[in-house]
């Protein structure tokens, strides 16, 4: 017989980033570490007082411990943004467990509402060894997805339209993004925006960086650090295509002005620093000028609060759309809809406004 409660307790504890000892401490002697271990092993069951305490400390509803997902998954080929994602092993496990929980709900919902969902994943067959190879891959993506030379209004929306499962999580400050595979489906995990009006250019670049890890094949001779740089080249080239960058930036320049960079950022949704890197790669500036730009950028503390704003929400909405479709067709109840969106039924009812 499956140990449902024990497995869900382990999952909730990992999502909270707690060890058994941490959980015992948070429960303030309501139950011992040894008893918690027995709960997880399925050798003991908690009483109602302990169950409520676990629910409060782990921030999950009591029902969570007894819900059995219809779709059970295993995240495979997990890959983080190395050299930029600086999180501990415990935080990493927490992120992965949250991603797994979200994926289970997402895929279960999709199976109920839209089981014949088609995907248009980008696949690039050539081996990537150089920055020019990454540039060519970006050109190919724009061609295959019929993007032309126009700015991309919403990167996250574009990826969702192509069938990628984009998930946002509450995650530690050191986390940028990760990718994973689930039964042939491609998952992209991003950090949830916490501030109203937060600058989205970094999230756009991160989403495309994870797309690069999904889509590109790198030479085995290349070290991981170089692969990360090539992913960055690809994502920047998708955002700001070479022909347009060369036309707008012009060659042999010695200066960049903040006003000009703001115009580029607000049109293309790309950060100042990524524009500098594009200019260097495309031969518009020399490495000496590039170094000067970066020094000036940091001296003015622009990396802390970069001016200019790209007007896009960059939030995944596919799961919400599936929920509302399920409600409108009476496939889902209010309680089920709330479960799939990971919120309480009363909170969901509060924000639900039926027109007809």
PLM feature spans:
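Active-site hotspot residues in diverse enzymes, especially metal/ion-binding acidic/histidine motifs
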Residues: 1-356
């Amino acid at each position: 017989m499956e140990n449902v409660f024990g497995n869900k307790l382990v999952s909730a504890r990992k999502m909270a980033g707690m060890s058994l000892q941490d959980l015992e401490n948070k429960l303030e002697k309501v139950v011992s570490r040894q008893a918690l271990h027995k709960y997880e092993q399925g050798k003991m069951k908690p009483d109602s007082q302990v169950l409520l305490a676990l629910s409060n400390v782990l921030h999950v509803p009591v029902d969570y411990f007894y819900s059995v997902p219809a779709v059970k998954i295993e995240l495979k080929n997990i890959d983080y943004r190395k050299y930029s994602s600086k999180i501990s092993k415990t935080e990493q496990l927490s992120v992965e467990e949250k991603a797994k929980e979200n994926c289970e709900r997402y895929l279960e919902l999709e199976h109920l509402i839209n089981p014949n969902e088609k995907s248009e994943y980008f696949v690039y067959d050539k081996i990537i060894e150089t920055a020019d190879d990454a540039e060519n891959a970006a050109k190919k993506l724009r061609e295959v997805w019929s993007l032309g030379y126009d700015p991309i209004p919403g990167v996250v929306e574009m990826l969702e339209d192509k069938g990628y499962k984009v998930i946002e999580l509450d995650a530690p400050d050191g986390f940028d993004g990760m990718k994973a595979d689930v039964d042939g489906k491609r998952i992209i995990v991003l950090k949830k925006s916490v501030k109203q009006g937060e600058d989205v250019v970094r999230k756009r670049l991160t989403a495309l960086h994870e797309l690069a890890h999904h889509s590109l094949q790198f030479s085995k001779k290349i070290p991981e650090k170089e692969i990360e740089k090539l992913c960055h080249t690809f994502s920047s080239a998708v955002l700001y295509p070479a022909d347009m960058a060369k036309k707008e930036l012009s060659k042999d320049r010695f200066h960049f002005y903040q006003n000009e960079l703001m115009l580029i950022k607000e049109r293309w949704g790309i950060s100042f620093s990524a524009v500098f890197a594009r200019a260097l790669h495309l031969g518009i500036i020399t490495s000496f000028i590039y170094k000067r730009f970066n020094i000036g950028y940091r001296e003015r503390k622009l990396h802390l609060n970069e001016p200019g704003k790209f007007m896009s929400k960059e939030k995944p909405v596919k799961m919400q759309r599936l929920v509302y479709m399920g409600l409108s067709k009476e496939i889902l109840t209010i309680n089920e809809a709330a479960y799939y969106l990971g919120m309480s039924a009363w909170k969901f009812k509060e924000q639900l406004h039926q027109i007809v």
